[in-house]
């Protein structure tokens, strides 16, 4: 982990960075001009856990959504972005975090028509309507 932090510091050298803390980041120190639980920029709020009471544009990451779809008879499980109106949930990009199925009750806010999933493939991102995800 120390080597990862050094590598990240080198990558970010000379760049302005903003870091929003999450529950997996309690003992991590990252080079950043801002570090906190929430950050707003140009009317968009970035936070770790979505706030269902805030109806403004928001990007959050806590749930690490995944979707399971059938393709040519095979069940495929992929991390995904979830988008509905003015909200985006980010997928997990690390190997140490799992994923929450988009059909889980915790994500009921995103379980209706109009929600789009963006599944991460090895070389591309695939957009599908949420109703294509297996229940």
Where are these regions (language model features)?
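Extended recognition/assembly regions associated with phosphoester-bond processing machinery
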Residues: 1-135
């Amino acid at each position: 982990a120390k080597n990862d932090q050094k590598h990240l510091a080198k990558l970010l050298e000379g760049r302005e960075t903003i870091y929003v803390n999450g529950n997996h980041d309690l003992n991590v120190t990252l080079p950043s001009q801002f570090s906190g639980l929430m950050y707003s920029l140009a009317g968009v709020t970035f936070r770790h856990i979505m706030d269902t009471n805030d109806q403004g544009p928001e990007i959050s990451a806590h749930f690490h959504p995944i979707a399971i779809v059938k393709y040519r008879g095979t069940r495929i499980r992929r991390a995904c972005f979830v988008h509905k109106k003015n909200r985006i949930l980010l997928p997990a990009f690390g190997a140490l975090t799992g994923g929450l199925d988009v059909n889980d009750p915790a994500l009921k806010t995103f379980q209706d028509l109009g929600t789009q999933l963006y599944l991460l493939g090895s070389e591309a991102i695939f957009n599908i309507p949420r109703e294509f995800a297996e229940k």
